[in-house]
Amino acid sequence: MASQQIDWAEDLVTEVVGERLKAATRKRGAEPLSHAIEAKKLRESWEALRVWLRAKLLAKRGASIPGFGRFTWQVLGDYRPSDLQDRPEELIPLRPVFQFSEDFCKAHLLPWRPISEDKLVECADLNYSILALRHTSRLTKDMVWSALRDLQRKIGDRIASGYSLTLDFGVGQLVAERGKPRFCFDASKLRREEEQVVPQ
């Protein structure tokens, strides 16, 4: 059965907004939430994450999203990750790598296995304050943190439930079918013209 073209990010946003509105109506004395404002927070946080992630990978650095996973580079051949700084003029062959975090896999009953670290570029942890300040118009650190936490949880729920999912991360797509996720990097979004990226 062919899957329809669905904007999965928008679908996840709609679900999370619905959950937030239900939770707010259950609380006594809580101010009512606006569907449009909650959706805007989630969309803007998601787009900020995509922009940050792409910037890190274009700079040949790894990016770690706490509680979700990491996106990094594997250095190929006889090179080492330190060669990226030591020999910046040299074209060093790289392969993009994605790995879910062990916590994410445990929470959603997904298999997890470690990856050999010796050829991987070190990852920078996502800083929610910097993400909010640099990549959003008015969101606070707490707004971005809670938005991404809720979206990550919903992604995990979808994968664990066996739903088909294709979600654009700005550097490629997270694809899940029948509870089996994989990440498909888009080489055109990961390189500048003078660089060489080896496909997965």
PLM regions with names:
Residues 1-200:
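Strongly charged
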